């Protein structure tokens, strides 16, 4: 058994490779890595727009000052625990953070941030994401070895871009990769 060097990918972005993951939730997905340890990994897909919600109704915000719906996009973060919601947001908002990455991003999961967003007092940029993606120990490392994912540094412009459909293509361009040059064969050279 060989000893492998562990590379922590917390705060990085995973880019799904084309022709490898061709169907389902991970096809052309971008995942912001919340945590990556030798015990496993957790991330949020940030380019799977599924709907728009009214924050006031969804979070049952009881305030007569907000008279019109506050519509925000809702993203599917992964196949695990869809009943859990997270705000992936810029770090200019720092109340009751769940995670702070020190790379201008943070994660919150509380009623206070939804109220602050509804009142226009929330973070400059945010995504509301339900569910998350999780890997067992060694699983992500295996997927990386078989070229299912590319790794790039966090880029807020990709995360908070207006058009979720173009995020994946823009990430490839940022990496200097043209989709048509990918082989449909998997493995290592």
Curated annotation (Swiss-Prot):
SUPFAM superfamilies: VC0467-like (SSF143456)
Family: Belongs to the UPF0301 (AlgH) family.
The species this protein was found in: Rickettsia rickettsii (strain Sheila Smith)
Name of protein: UPF0301 protein A1G_00270
A GO CC term assigned to this protein in UniProt: cytosol
Coiled coil: none
